[in-house]
């Protein structure tokens, strides 16, 4: 007996305000910031198959310098936020890693820190590095909206009077499969210019 098996693919809808998904055989695309960035020039990897924010100029008015979204899972996002650092010359001027992690967890009800670490971010081509704090938090219930519970990973670096906050998010249910990929993106952030 012959059985006709036809497969159907769910149509992937490009999120409103985002470009069509970009793909790369390496599994990652690379963004080099444009001249309009509010900070120094930088690069960051973002997952293949994801969409890039179309109108970055209007997003910059609220501190978003780049934004990416998984069209198959709208809770999975990656964004670069740039803001004035005031008198801070390093992320350490904001406090210890423990203090910064506690502050991020306290920023929303039912949010807890699930990971934290120090690392270095490359600045320029001469071997200069800046201290970066990575903080991973999980938030549950109403705060995460229709996604139920969610996980957020941020990398925070201060250089040249600017704070660069790289934020990756995913629903808690998709985090186990997204974690390595999103961590790679957060860690790929590099500042291209030095003082």
Each language-model region and where it sits:
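N-terminal targeting sequences that direct proteins away from the cytosol to non-cytosolic compartments
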Residues: 1-90, 94, 109-126, 137-148, ...
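Glycine-rich, pocket-lining loop/helix-strand segments that form or immediately flank
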Residues: 90-104
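Short hydrophobic/aromatic beta-strand or adjacent loop that forms the aromatic wall/cage
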Residues: 128-132
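Long, low-complexity hydrophobic alpha-helices enriched in A/L/V/I and glycine
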Residues: 153-155
């Amino acid at each position: 007996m012959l059985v006709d098996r036809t497969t159907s693919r769910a149509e992937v809808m490009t999120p409103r305000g985002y470009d069509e998904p970009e793909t790369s055989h390496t599994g990652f695309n690379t963004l080099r910031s444009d001249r309009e960035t509010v900070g120094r020039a930088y690069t960051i990897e973002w997952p293949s198959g994801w969409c890039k924010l179309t109108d970055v100029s209007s997003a910059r008015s609220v501190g978003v310098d780049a934004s990416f979204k998984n069209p198959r899972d709208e809770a999975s996002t990656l964004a670069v936020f740039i803001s004035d650092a005031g008198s801070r010359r390093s992320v350490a001027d904001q406090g210890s890693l423990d203090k910064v992690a506690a502050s991020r967890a306290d920023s929303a009800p039912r949010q807890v820190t699930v990971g934290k670490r120090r690392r270095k971010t490359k600045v320029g081509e001469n071997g200069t590095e800046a201290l970066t704090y990575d903080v991973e938090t999980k938030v549950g219930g109403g705060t995460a909206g229709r996604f139920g519970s969610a996980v957020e990973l941020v990398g925070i670096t201060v250089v040249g009077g600017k704070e660069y906050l790289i934020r990756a998010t995913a629903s808690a249910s998709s985090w186990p499969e997204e974690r390595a990929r999103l961590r790679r993106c957060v860690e790929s952030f590099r500042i291209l210019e030095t003082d």
